[in-house]
Amino acid sequence: MVSFTTILVAATAALVAANPVPPSIDEMREIYVKSRDLHARGGTPSSTGTHDGFYYSWWTDNGAQATYTNNAGGSYSITWSGNGNLVGGKGWNPGSARNVTYSANYRPNGNSYLSVYGWTRNPLVEYYVVENFGTYDPSSQASRKGTINVDGATYQVAQSTRTNQPSIDGTRTFQQYWSVRQQKRSSGTVDMKKHFDAWASMGMKLGTHDYQIVATEGYFSSGSSTVTIQR
């Protein structure tokens, strides 16, 4: 990642050469922000669509240096490093209570999740069935509802509220639902119906499904992930 000093020195020198009046602090800050954003866009821009018969979603706040690649079939790869948030993967649109079979070479350094990830509307819900994670268990700072046994493992169920945060409908306030596997794995089959049914029994209602992907997410961390899902 290019440092603040490198960007600021280069940009300020260019400004001074063009204008003998020294730039103000505000002008230097504006130069840095613009230069930083241009550098961040050296990664893969956010996008959604279809590829080789699968839906894909890739989102980044441009804070990290991150590259997303759609590979053949149900496979994708992500590499990332730096200060920012990113999430992407392949799957389906709309989502459903399907069995999701996946395999991954998942190598996080820091805060990251490997999960079945999706959204619903009415109510607006962002949900995660976390199969593996880096240094931070996302259920630890949420309201824990209990544990369930699914697919031969224990999952911690939790719920949290996101206030004025990015969503599939723009900046909104919405609920997050979590099932976090306590015995981490990077391949297997996830029975989404069992998770959805368990959530419903705890008062965690879903709405009409939007997309559903096997996602890699990174937050102020680094790592690499190659994931393949089955039809």
Swiss-Prot record:
One of its GO terms (biological process) is xylan catabolic process. The keyword Cytoplasm does not apply. GO terms for molecular function: endo-1,4-beta-xylanase activity. It comes from Pyricularia oryzae (strain 70-15 / ATCC MYA-4617 / FGSC 8958). It comes from the Eukaryota. GO terms for cellular component: extracellular region. The keyword Hydrolase applies. Its EC number is 3.2.1.8. This is Endo-1,4-beta-xylanase 4. Its main location: secreted. Residues 1-18 form the signal peptide. Belongs to the glycosyl hydrolase 11 (cellulase G) family. The active site is at residues 126, 217. Keywords: Carbohydrate metabolism, Glycoprotein, Glycosidase, Hydrolase, Polysaccharide degradation, Secreted, Signal, Xylan degradation. It is found in: Secreted. SUPFAM superfamilies: Concanavalin A-like lectins/glucanases. Glycans are attached at residue 99. InterPro entries: ConA-like_dom_sf, GH11/12, GH11_AS_1, GH11_AS_2, GH11_dom, Glyco_hydro_11. It catalyses: Endohydrolysis of (1->4)-beta-D-xylosidic linkages in xylans.
